[in-house]
Amino acid sequence: MSGIVTYGSYIPRYRIRPEEIARVWGEDPEKMKNGIFILSKSVPGPDEDVATISVEAARNALKRSNIDPNDIGAIYIGSESHPYAVKPTATIVAAAIGMPFRTFAADYEFACKAGTAAMQNIKAMVDSNMIKYGMAIGSDTSQGAPGDALEYTASAGGTAMVIGRDNVIAEINKTISVATDTPDFWRREGEPYPKHGERFTGEPGYFKHVIGAARDIMSELNTKPDDYDYVVFHQPNGKFPTRAAKILGFREEQYREGLITPYIGNTYSGSTMTGLSAILDVSRPGDRILAVSFGSGAGSDAFDITVTDNILDYHRENAPGVRKMMESTEYIDYAVYSKFRKILVFGDNLE
């Protein structure tokens, strides 16, 4: 059976606390922090974007395995913040890691589930013998308008997953998707920041799709929450995934390991995949994982995954784990944050 052969993540080391953002905009710091259950969020450095984050995640994945990049036949990168409107991120990353000329490459978009959509397509290509291995990446330097609620959560990070049939460390037993036309969140071409339809964000958007996809895949597999050792959902904030888990009947010990948003914010396309990466960092043979992503617009991808015995010989230690990167931090104030995120616009002669 096909599944994850290796994986790697990258999280920028810079952080800003919600209290610092609230201070600038005259909001109640404790109210903002507790309202979204975010303690800090990651901030990309001035020289970091989706391409560099994806390269680092991909390299970390390759450090943990003996896979020759020439054997990777496809690379798909999901993101809301590709650095170019016309020029693929996938070709940049493919060149950086040494993939061959004969390569399937494309950038994906479906809000925050573009990365998991890439995983599904890579799995299908492996299963149909079109490729031996394929790499799916979910990565973002997400945007939030200054002073908007999204500014408190929109962060940066990404994860790469290589899928194949040889030396699989986590079998993908089944994957399904759900989708509807829901106007919960959007950004038009040329606009710097997204807008959100607040009344569509919760129940009609996130909860309908995440809970619906989770229930559908468990129904088809005849499983129940107690059959899983871990569960991870898309994490727009710290409260939505915990509420979804409780509605479905999961316990805190099942979702705690993959819940990373309180410490690094919402990495958008990287969110579910990085939460899954954190789980794989500590998983053991036989562990069963339910992963459900969410993308505004709207849709969810659900995965039923089983960790194999190959995890015992897998070199997780060759690249930093998610928790280690979460702990390697440098806090910045709003002035530096504004500079890094280019909120401050300089004249032509200034840098």
Swiss-Prot record:
Would the keyword Acyltransferase turn up in this protein's UniProt record? yes
What Pfam families does this protein's entry cite?
ACP_syn_III_C (PF08541)
Q: Could you tell me which pathway this protein works in?
A: Metabolic intermediate biosynthesis; (R)-mevalonate biosynthesis; (R)-mevalonate from acetyl-CoA: step 2/3
**Active-site residues, Swiss-Prot/TrEMBL:** E80, C112, H234
Catalyses which reaction? acetoacetyl-CoA + acetyl-CoA + H2O = (3S)-3-hydroxy-3-methylglutaryl-CoA + CoA + H(+)
The residues the record assigns to binding (3S)-3-hydroxy-3-methylglutaryl-CoA are D28, C112, T153, T201, H234, R243, N266, S296
Residues binding CoA, per UniProt: R199, K239
Q: Tell me its EC number(s), please.
A: 2.3.3.10
Give the first-level EC class, as a single word. transferase
Could you tell me which InterPro entries the record lists for this protein? ACP_syn_III_C, HMG_CoA_Synthase, Thiolase-like
Origin: domain of life: Archaea
List the Gene Ontology MF annotations in alphabetical order. acetyl-CoA C-acetyltransferase activity; hydroxymethylglutaryl-CoA synthase activity
Query: What job does this protein perform?
Result: Catalyzes the condensation of acetyl-CoA with acetoacetyl-CoA to form 3-hydroxy-3-methylglutaryl-CoA (HMG-CoA). Functions in the mevalonate (MVA) pathway leading to isopentenyl diphosphate (IPP), a key precursor for the biosynthesis of isoprenoid compounds that are building blocks of archaeal membrane lipids.
Similarity field = Belongs to the thiolase-like superfamily. Archaeal HMG-CoA synthase family.
Subunit structure of this entry?
Interacts with acetoacetyl-CoA thiolase that catalyzes the precedent step in the pathway and with a DUF35 protein. The acetoacetyl-CoA thiolase/HMG-CoA synthase complex channels the intermediate via a fused CoA-binding site, which allows for efficient coupling of the endergonic thiolase reaction with the exergonic HMGCS reaction.
Please state what the protein is called. Hydroxymethylglutaryl-CoA synthase
List the lineage, top down: Archaea, Methanobacteriati, Thermoplasmatota, Thermoplasmata, Thermoplasmatales
